[in-house]
Amino acid sequence: FPDYVDVTIPPNIAPLNFKLKDACTEARAILECGPEKLEIKTGKDACFVIPASGWKRLLRAASGNHLNVTVQAFVNDEWIAYAPFIIKVAKEPVDGWLAYRLIEPGYELWNRMGIYQRNLENYTENAIIENKMSGNNCMNCHSFCMQNPEKMLFHMRETYSCTLLIDGDKVEKLNTKTDQTLSPLVYPSWHPSGKYVAFSVNKTKQAFHMNDRNRVEVFDSASDVVVYDTQKHEIVTSPLLSSEGAFETFPTFSPDGNTLYFCSAKARTMPKEYDQVRYDLCSVSFDPATRRFGTVVDTLYKASEIDKSVSFPRVSPDGKYLLYTLSGYGNFSIWHKDADLYMIDLSTLQSYPLEAANSDDVESYHSWSSDSRWIVFSSRRMDGLYTRPFIAYIDEKGQACKPFLLPQKDTDFYFRFMKSYNIPEFITGEVKRQGRALAVKAKEDKGVDVRFK
C-alpha cells in the first residue's frame, strides 16, 4: 500500500513510499532503470522509505521510460519474491503544487477546516487559511485563474460571510448577494483574462436517506449562472442562463474565453422529484469585450436522454478535451456511488469514460494541470467515506493512465488521517502565506457591494 503497480507518474513527484500488507521479519525493494539502481531495506514494519536524492536520480534516468521494481520479504524463515512490476515515468512534469480543503466527512457540523497547499515535489504542506482564524466558520470553493497562485478567490460562509478575491498583493472583500440574484455567488470559474469570473447562484438544500447507499442528498430548488466583472464589481447574466424553467449551474469558461459551458436541467418540484433531475452539458458564446452572451444555447451532451446527469465540467487548458462527472441524477455527485469521470473530445463531441481512472466508488471533483497532461480528482475508492486525491496522466489521445494516490512520507498516513480532501486544484507555485491578514480582512473590512447590472 498504496497500489503503485503500473501507474504513470511525473518526473518531479515526491518519493512513492509504500509498505507491505503481509507480515514479515525483514524486506527489501530494488528500483532500477538502466544503470541506475536503488535498494531499500526495511524491518518488521515493512515500510519502504525512499531517499529523496536517490529517487530524483532514478526519475531523471527514467523520464519517458519506466522503473522496474522488485520486492522481496523474509517470511517464515525464507525469502519470497513478489511479482515484479513497473512504474511508468512520463516526460511531462506536473504543476508543482496542489491546493485543497481539508474537512471532516460530515454533513452539517464541522469544527476545524482550512484551505491548504502541498508541494508535490516533496511532502511540505502549509495552510493558505484556517477557520480557527475566523471564528470556526465555513470556507469553500477556492478557485485559481489558470492555475495561477497569485490570482485566487474563496468564499466564507456563516460568520464573516463574504468572498475574498486575491490578485497579487491586492485583497478584496466582496459582498456578493444582490436583490436580483438567488444567493451569494457559489461555484466559480475564472475567465482566462482574469477580468471575469463565472458563478452559479443556488438555493441549496440537504436531506438524508434512511436506507440508501448514498448517505446524503444535496439538491437545488433553483439555480442560475452569472458572470462577475472583477474590475467594475458588476454581475451580468442572460435569460438563457437564468430561466425559471431550468436549473443552471457549474459554469466553466473555455481557455480562449469565448465560450461558457454549464450544466442545465429541466426544473422540477423539489425535493419530491430530487431523483428525476438530470443535467445536460450546454454552452453559450461570450464576448469578453462587451460582456454579452450569445442568443443560442448549444447542448453538447444530452445526458438526460440516457437517464444520466452531468456535473463539474472542466476544459483542458489546450482546449482539446472537456472532463466531467457523470452520475445517475442530480448535481451533487460527490456522494453518489455511481459517479465516474468522463471525457468529451471537443473536436468530435465524442464522449467516453476514463476507464483506467474510475473505480466502483465515487469519483467526483477534478481539475487539470496547466499543460493538459495531468488531472487530479477526488475519490472514495479506499473506504467509501473519505475523499482522497488521485493523480492521473492523460495521453495524447485523451485517455487516462492508471492513477496514483497522492504520496505521503508516512505510509500509514491515510489510515490515521480523519479528514477528506475537497476540491483538489493544481497550481503552478506556492500561494503567498497571509492567512491571518485574510482573516482580518474578512472580519474588519466593510467590503465592496457587488451590483447587478
Label every model-predicted segment.
Residues F1-K453:
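Sequence signature of WD/YWTD-type beta-propeller architectures
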